[in-house]
Amino acid sequence: MAEPLANLRAFSYRYPDAAEPALRSLELELGEGELVLLAGPSGSGKSTLLRALCGLVPHYHGGEASGELRVCGLDVREHGPAELGGLVGMVFQEPETQVVSTTVRGELELPLELRGESAAARARALEEVSLALAISHLLDRPTDTLSGGELQRVALAAALVLRPRLILLDEPTSQLDPVAGDELIGLLRRLNEEWGMGVVLAEHRLERCLGAADRVISVDEGAVAFDGSPQDFCAWADESDPQLSPPGARMFALAGLRPLPVSVKAARSSLRELGIAVRAGEPDSEEPEQARPRWRGRRERQSIALSARDLWVERDTGGGVRDVLRRVELTIRPGERVALMGRNGAGKSTLLRAAARLIEPVRGSIEAPDGCSLLPQSPSDLFVHERVGDELPGDEGLRALASVGLEQAVERDPRDLSGGERERLAIAIVSAGRSSGGRSGAVCLDEPTRGMDGARKRELGGRLAAIAAAGQAVVVATHDVEFAAGFATRVVLLGDGELIADGRPAEILAGGWYFATEVARILGGGAITPEGGAELLRSRIRELGAGLEVELR
């Protein structure tokens, strides 16, 4: 019998000075050629498990480990990351902290050089991995000119260039647009199916990858809560933790339909078998309570929080200066909640940085009369202390920490928090105005849902709605269409530096091929959230009457 790629026996781990273990008596086997999806709430231990599988736990982080952990036949307690590096590749939540070379080519060549590969072997490996990840055009770019999504693909390429037996990915689609995210999952599936590479990825956006997985392991408080097939996971999540359910499965559950689907294709097939025809392009009557603007005073309606007029921004990308933003005309008023969307490199982050006066336009103007606070893609950029409580001191700071669920973390180092926890701390800092010297008229956030589970996203949406209700405009650059559908009162879509769509979420997120929610893709329009989709399906079920054997509950 072949030895598993990874074998954990009663494996536990506690970080230095932590009161509770991060991993508790894990009993797991990861087989050769499996594609495993790690699910679970933020801070549940998913990232720690990945770090253990590549040897960073305990060799880099320290702390106490017990039990047995073997990866590719090596005892991880005796063999660290250097010895596992050629066998196990790792892509972290924040790729900007993983990329160390000044150019993309140098980043990909570095692991090959360290292994002593010849120039010919390096050239071939670079050609293959850059083609696979569609980054050939980036090879000679300085890494500090890349967008977050481009950095994500470069970090993955560097992890794959040695062709490891096992690849570990922590939130790999978190900074990728829907197109690039689908391409990445397709690539991982191809590597898994055609080359037998083991894949373990931790994700919160399960709708992107559940259909590609062979197996789902859900982790909660450092222990395995579920281990089984994607189909069984959907049924388990619906009963045990609906926050983990992907949107399509959640819609089916709310409508009383079974079985719960693991993909858009499976959902459409089930609806056809049940004889439920949903008319594509039906007007979307839903507008979630959270998405309704409440701050509507006459004077405030006429005022402006953020305004761009014929905005042009240039950037040196390493291959010459190019226009990153062109002819942008945009007015955002107090109380609006705007989702700024578009492909990687479309100009979303540049627009937010221009609003915060971090870069200057070459033509036109962008104004924020009452100032603009910015949460950057890397939340760690805002941390200046070694203690969470010192980032937001005093009673007001403690209230801000409590609002993001971090009141118990006041004594921890911000850099030791999980990715989702760091994001929440940064949001508290920005919303409190600490990053801009006071309360601003516009609060801008760049990919704030990275590392967050469904429950935390809903909490974030509620907090941002409260900020907007108090009179500040909230602008969120995001690839998370599901979050945008429930949070935003308006969606602005950028394409290659230009504004190409601007309207209600129901208009923008239902009609497109890629910037559409899972519910919209299943139904062909008519609804964009699980709640709205379930209402539409229940209406169709009632129209069909007693001839349809569906239990409405």
Q: What function would you assign to each model-found segment?
A:
Residues A120-L138, G397-A409, S431-A432:
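Conserved ABC ATPase "signature" region
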Residues E68-E83, I359-L375, P379:
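ABC ATPase NBD Q-loop/coupling interface
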Residues A159-L160, S431, S436-G437:
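ABC ATPase C-loop
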Residues A235-Q302, F515-R553:
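ABC ATPase nucleotide-binding domains
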Residues E203-H204, T478-H479:
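H-loop/switch region of ABC-family ATPase nucleotide-binding domains
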Residues I167-D170, V443-D446:
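Catalytic Walker B motif of ABC-type/P-loop ATPase nucleotide-binding domains
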Residues P142-L146, E150, D413-L417, E421:
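Conserved ABC ATPase signature
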